[in-house]
Regions:
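Positively charged n-region of N-terminal signal peptides that target proteins for export
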Residues: 1-5, 476
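Bacterial N-terminal signal peptides
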Residues: 4-16
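Noncatalytic, solvent-exposed loop/strand surfaces
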Residues: 18-476
Length: 476
């Protein structure tokens, strides 16, 4: 009862109390401007279940990353069939408020790898905007009071995987990309009122890449990496300024801006230059898997090879993969290109060849977005393989197994001369020194013992990490 009364009193406090300070913030997916960098902050490099734990709070399920504003750490979460935005006290880890998005229907999502709360909220310090593929955008003040909502029907994502893209806020504008096979578009809303400023139709049937705002000589743009193509839109009007061919078929990683240059690295299975994933012909699949000889592959026949992916491949949802469905998948995959590149600003129209500063084809991540730090463009791929390219020239500096093995969903973050990599399978945080010509591990920490899909947040002397069941705050 005392705890309940405390939560009620905290919720009734004015929003100014939770936001009225100048403490460092982490306002969106990947932090300030989506950079992954916390300049001037000083969190520990050593951490673990019993090491430098400032606090640890249980959290409901969800894949969104924490953001930080004022006294609050904010996530989205899924519990008892409801979609929540939840705020925790930054100092103590106590829950301050939670707000139900009141979705009428949940989007279809992959029960193994997805979540109806996979999108990270965004803030500009006065309000918090959350996106749910089930119902659209919802905006709250810092006390959890609803300010506006932009209703959208449940997203029908490719293969029913579920939503993953996060909103951003730039110059008072909320920007959201929603790419689905039925309808793809980018929308821009007034952050204060939720009024639609503009929307633009897109041709990308699937994308999970969060956009980035780019200051260019001709004005601010919002850049979106989608299926096989990247596009730059005018932030004020939504007009398409430029585009380029050469992104993966299924974009999950996001671009980043550094020194006026745009960087991107992405990988998706089955690209034309993909040496890692050789997609079999349908005849080969029938020979190896079609036990009942019906000319199709059932879920049971696919077994572990298709575990977690079957729903995405079964277009008509008849629990079988046919030759026609497999052809659609192969065509989709073949249209993309897996690479890493740097792009200069100022272009219009098709800039595929004209504005590319450098391009590489090694080390690209599938889910974890790369980071520009210490004069290098650094990325981590599954297996703990860390690749560093010279920021200016694109020269490869190293590619070595420097982080813990396993998959990587969380994007690297950096501050105080260090880069932090967090593994998905057991939450091992590996910290390397930035700007070196060989990977120098500064700390390889004990596993947190839970899966980690969320990108850490850094503010002040603390790094915040969301695991499958907890939110940690680590400080010296």
């Amino acid at each position: 009862m005392i705890r309940c009364l405390t939560l009620v009193m905290l919720t009734l406090l004015p929003a100014a109390i939770w936001g009225a300070d100048n403490r460092p913030s982490w306002p969106q997916f990947r932090g300030p401007a989506g950079s992954g960098i916390a300049d001037g902050q000083n969190p520990p490099i050593e951490m673990g279940p019993e090491k430098n734990v400032k606090w640890k709070a249980p959290v409901p399920s969800g894949l969104s990353s924490p953001i930080i504003t004022g006294e609050l750490v904010v996530i989205t979460a899924f519990e008892n069939e409801k979609l929540y935005t939840i705020a925790y006290d930054r100092t103590s880890g106590k829950e301050v408020w939670r707000a139900d998005a009141q979705a009428k229907q949940l989007e279809v999502y992959n029960q193994t790898h997805g979540s109806p709360t996979a999108s990270t909220p965004a803030t500009e310090g006065e309000r918090i905007v959350s996106y749910f593929g089930s119902c659209g955008l919802v905006c709250y003040d810092l006390a959890g009071k609803p300010l506006w909502r932009f209703e959208m029907p449940p997203a029908a994502t490719a293969g029913g995987f579920g939503s993953g893209v996060s909103p951003i806020i730039a110059d008072g504008t909320v920007v959201l990309v929603r790419d689905t096979p039925q309808e793809s578009k980018i929308v821009a809303l007034d952050a204060v009122t939720g009024t639609l400023k503009w929307e633009a139709k897109r041709q990308s049937p699937s994308s999970y890449s969060t956009p980035v705002a780019w200051d260019t000589p001709t004005g601010k743009q919002v850049v979106v990496a989608g299926h096989a193509r990247m596009i730059g839109y005018d932030l004020k009007t939504g007009a398409e300024r430029w585009s380029l061919a050469g992104t993966p078929s299924g974009c999950c990683s996001s671009p980043v801006i550094a020194g006026g240059t745009l960087y991107f690295a992405g990988w998706s299975p089955g690209g034309p230059d993909d040496k890692e994933t050789q997609m079999p012909t349908f005849d080969k699949m029938l020979k190896d898997m079609d036990k009942d000889k019906d000319g199709a592959i059932s879920r049971e026949e696919g077994g572990k090879d298709f575990e977690g992916m079957f729903a995405s491949m079964d277009g008509n949802k008849d629990n079988k993969i046919t030759s026609d469905e497999w052809d659609v998948i192969l065509k989709f995959m073949a249209e993309g290109i897996n690479n890493a590149f740097a792009l200069k600003s100022g272009g219009t129209g098709d800039i595929t060849d004209s504005h590319m500063l450098w391009k590489k084809s090694k080390g690209m991540p599938y889910l974890a977005s790369a980071i520009v730090y210490g004069g290098q463009y650094v990325m981590v791929k599954d297996g703990g393989i860390v690749t560093a390219y010279d920021e200016k020239t694109g020269d490869e500096l190293y590619q070595k197994r420097a982080a813990a093995t396993g998959a990587y969903y969380a994007s690297p973050v950096a501050c105080a001369g260090h880069i932090y990599f967090t593994s998905h399978d057991d939450g091992t945080v590996t910290v390397i020194k930035a700007g070196t010509t060989e990977p120098e591990v500064a700390a390889k920490n004990p596993p947190l013992g839970e899966k980690v899909a969320a990108t850490p947040a850094i503010a002040g002397d603390t790094i915040y990490i969301r695991t499958a069941g907890h939110l940690y705050a680590f400080a010296k």
